[in-house]
Amino acid sequence: MNAIGIKIKKADGNHDPGASKFFGAPVLPDGWAELFSEDIIFFGQIRLSDIAELDTENKLPHTGYLYLFLDVEMYPYQAMAFYYDGEPNVVVVDFNKAEVQFAHLNEDWLMSFEPVDEDFDGTRLFGVPSSGYETDEELLLQFDPLAESTGFLDNIDGYAYFFFGEDEDRIDGIRFGIDRS
């Protein structure tokens, strides 16, 4: 089983707004920004061409963008995932500002990718959950809140997970979970 490690670093200065990243300003297709209420936060965008060579099992499309959002109105948070097969063109500055608890998540944290073992302890795509989190669901993304100082869920000593949906459209049914080790 292949897994893709994600290294993150806070963007400094000029960078491509369409880059793969956590938090900050998403670059969305025209008309999408109006679809989100103030209870929705932007978690991340992955430019799928960035991982195409590393996704040897073709778990995701290799063109376009995968977007991850969280509905934080109630706990546990609900995942919202969208795939767009094109080039988005609208930068949405301060997307997370309206949600007071997450207003600080308006800086871009850029992603870089590398192959890792399926049980790598850290932020990654695919593989198996690191902490012994028991599930039959297939892992899309494991996020380590303590790996960097993003300020997201940094009060837990564990992981945040996004799991693929079980239906034919595996992106539409993505589920979010937290493991407090």
What does each model-found stretch correspond to?
Residues 1-181:
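Preference for intrinsically disordered or flexible, low-complexity segments
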